A protein has these predicted regions:
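Intrinsic-disorder/low-complexity signal
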Residues: 1-149, 153-242
Length: 242
């Protein structure tokens, strides 16, 4: 795993009126937060996943014969329980500010960022589970003029490829308007990281663009893919961050 060394929006697919969600797809891959009236306040970005049906134990097959519609909604896996699934997905982001400063916000190395001062991005654990699971990122769009671009990514901490065993999704919750959903359901059995979504300031307009690019390496490979130019070294989460 990699730890940092010191040193015009198109049409989109929307869900039902009840779901109040925009789904970014390959065909309709971007939305303007500015045009949605959602370019201020805190943008919350959340990572969630559940195991694919074939990876859930018990009498799953027999149960599906009796209740076929359960296949449409597999049981969710709560938190990061290693005993249940042995999958540890983490959320992070690369940032670049308009003053030229660049960096990463991620659990590795305790690089949690700051929401009220540069980089105006902060990683927070999921409070529902009482631990620093690293599943939520906050972006302070009140400082959008200072933000050039933010690349949100997901990686597998324990290095065991597992994207093909999970239904993972990243959801953006703007301060106003519908949430924005990006599914990571493409099958890439050997991938260890995925660039999910780019948040970019384009001539004063805040654009959210679907990426969903899987790579076999970690943060350094995502850096090279998007030309961030940071220097990377081996990184670890502390016991409290796991």
């Amino acid at each position: 795993l990699d730890g940092l060394w010191p040193g015009r929006a198109v049409e989109f697919d929307s869900g039902s009126a009840a779901s109040n969600a925009i789904e970014l797809t390959k065909r309709h891959d971007r939305v303007s937060l500015t045009k949605q009236g959602a370019e201020t306040g805190h943008l919350r970005i959340n990572l969630a996943w559940r195991m694919r049906t074939s990876d859930i134990g018990g009498n799953q097959r027999e149960s599906l014969l009796r209740h076929p519609f359960r296949a449409l909604k597999p049981p969710e896996v709560i938190g990061h329980s290693q005993s249940m699934v042995n999958v540890d997905l983490d959320l992070g982001c690369l940032y670049e500010l308009t003053d030229g400063s660049k960096g990463v916000v991620q659990p590795l190395g305790g690089l949690f960022g700051d929401v009220n001062s540069p980089p105006y991005v902060k990683l927070s654990g999921d409070d529902r589970f009482g631990s620093a699971s690293g599943e939520t990122v906050y972006v302070n769009l009140d400082h959008r003029d200072s933000i050039k671009r933010i690349l949100v990514f997901v990686y597998i901490y324990d290095q065991t490829p597992a994207f093909d065993r999970t239904h993972a999704s990243v959801t953006l919750y703007p301060s106003n308007g519908p949430r924005i959903e990006i599914g990571l359901d493409e099958r890439h059995p050997q991938a260890r990281s995925c660039a999910v979504v780019m948040i970019e300031n384009v001539k004063g307009e805040i654009i959210v663009r679907r990426e969903v690019k899987f790579v076999y390496g970690f943060q350094a490979e995502l850096d090279r893919l998007y030309g961030w130019g940071l220097q990377w070294g081996r990184g670890y989460k502390t016991k409290a961050e796991r």
